[in-house]
Amino acid sequence: MSHDISFGAVCRCVCTLLCWFAMTIVHAQPGTWQYYLAYGEPQQIEKAEQGLFVKASGNLYHYNLNDQSVTTFDRSNGLNGGQLSHIKWCSEAHRLIAIYTNANIDLITAEGEVTNMPDLYMATMAGSKKVHRIVTDGSIAYLCVGSSIVKIDVANAHVVETYTLGSDVWNVMAVDGNLYANTAASGVMVGRMSDNLINPANWHSTSHFPESIYDAYRGDYDAYISIVSQIDAGGPHYNEFNRLWFVNGCLYGVGGGWYDGGQMNRTAQWQQMDHEGHWQRIDTPMKKDAVSMAIDPADATHLYIATCGNGLFEFRNGQPVAQYTAGNSLLASAIPGNNDYVRVDGLFYDRQHRLWMTNSETQHPLIRMNSEGTMESLDHPSLFYNGTPLTILRNPTTDHTGKVWLVNSHNHHPCLVRIDPETDEVDCFDALRNQDETPLRDIYSFNCVAEDKDGNMWAGTNQGPLMLTPQQQQSPDYGYTQIVVPRNDGSGYGDYLLEGISVTAMAIDGGNRKWIGTESNGVYVISSDNTTEVAHYTSADSGLLSDRIESIAIDGQTGRVYIGTEEGLCAVVSDATDAAEKMEKGGVRAYPNPVAPDYTGPITIEGLSYDADVRIVNTAGMLVARGRSTGGTYIWDGCDSKGRRVASGVYHVLTATSDGHRGTVCRIAIIR
């Protein structure tokens, strides 16, 4: 393959790119973490010099009283944790003490400079590390931590000493050289601050103490709540994202409740973030637990919300227009006569634009509704086990043939269920054994399902991921595949992929990689051939907010992976986008472009076809770098094949499809 490139063309390209330099759109680079945190519910307010620090919905922002500017804080600008439990301004040290629910501590100046103080988080302590209160005395702060008092020097950011009192400490006060502690079991105790208070013998009960030791701490809340209540710090309204969908360029989420019995009675609202990052929160008449959503494929302003208790709600243009429940529809209550238990756990549209819903724990577990609002039930035998309906049918996904897959998340009969809306056939894949006929033991819940680009169906269970190959999908009797990952240690042995790890969410990116969210182990990214761990994100070593993952959704255009966690919503920019069906002139693009002299990061090339061959050559036609796209994206490090940074000039990106057909050419200008 040869290309004649004239000197004049190169000059014109360089000049054009230099003119574009000031207008280059800033793209988030792969590996960048972003946060979408709620600030809608003020919980604590601390006056700090010329501004207010506000803990709201468990997160932190600063409001400048002079210019009314708002600065939100998260991991991207220095914080070292997720949800906050307490904040307290230390006026003498000029720092805010911010304590997270995991007992990590950040000290923050009024200018936003953050110093991490992980001593308490890393300390080994008997009993709980739950912080009940922060009390300051000059530049010293006393933390009521479980049954202990932790004394810290705020100005110098270190722990001075710890006093253990034997029962929960609710409050402390330093008065006239004495330290008073309000404890759960021993009432008020006191010790002379000049004594060695590490020794429990130097503490004793007292009936003489400041009465205010019983007062609840309100800080500056009452003085400034009238101001704070008018502040819009942006972001979503709540931090609960039990399910996520990325549809038509918008992110949708419902808060819902977990089905493991741990977090029911959560928010009944649903939220939407548009392509510009603006959030819309929809207040609804629902009482609790919005758990699923279906957007009308013919009208994006028309959608339905399923609830775990109040039936089905219909919305148009963000306004509720109808409720379907027991008494006015085929929906029934799991507890006859009690309309607070009308459970709709899953929703989906078929290709005929009919709405399907699951009605858990009733004799009509699957119902569909046409565009006129007429409902009919589909009481297929596969929806029942020993005469009892499958209990929790949820999290539907549609495969490339139009068939719909759901999970049954109850130990009564855990399985995958497949529905063919064209024929009304239902199959229950309940043969819990693997490809070697080995029984799959201790599985009590199927939690999520996703289809990869090879037509395999992936199921996340409480014991790890399982897969149904296209051949296994031909019959429910064929069992499942447990992926074996070679150890590559010369033994010839392998291990089952993520065996024993509870999988709660799954999504497939443009490169056919599996993003697997877990109950307590963060997020794994598995290669397209299923044998390599591409990445493992945890809250300890990445920007992930929490290791407890509830949902994952991917924007295939940008490669942004949205992750709903126990502590809120975050996203990481991946190096995979959806592949272009056909590479066309102008469709392949690179950024940053041009590449500035001080830039040393990755150069992203997008708009490629799946598994495209990518070659980067200089103006002389010499090969500089070569690789294959991940989905529609190829990442170039700006170096040649020997790892050396390339010189200034224009570099041509030559692409070809996976079957060898030539694609398009784009150019990258590099300025050293």
Predicted regions, residues:
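Carboxylate-rich, polar loop motifs that coordinate divalent cations or form catalytic acidic clusters
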Residues: I25-V588, L623, L654
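Surface-exposed loops/turns
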Residues: G81, Y610, A647-S648
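Short, glycine-anchored, charge-dense loop/turn motifs used at functional sites
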Residues: V614-V624, Y651
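Glycine-centered tight-turn motifs at strand-turn-strand junctions
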Residues: L623-V646, T657-H661
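Bacterial Sec-dependent N-terminal signal peptides
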Residues: M1-W33, W356, W405
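Glycine-centered coil/turn sites that cap beta-strands in beta-rich domains
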Residues: K582-R615, T633-W636
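C-terminal tail/sorting-segment detector
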Residues: H652-R672
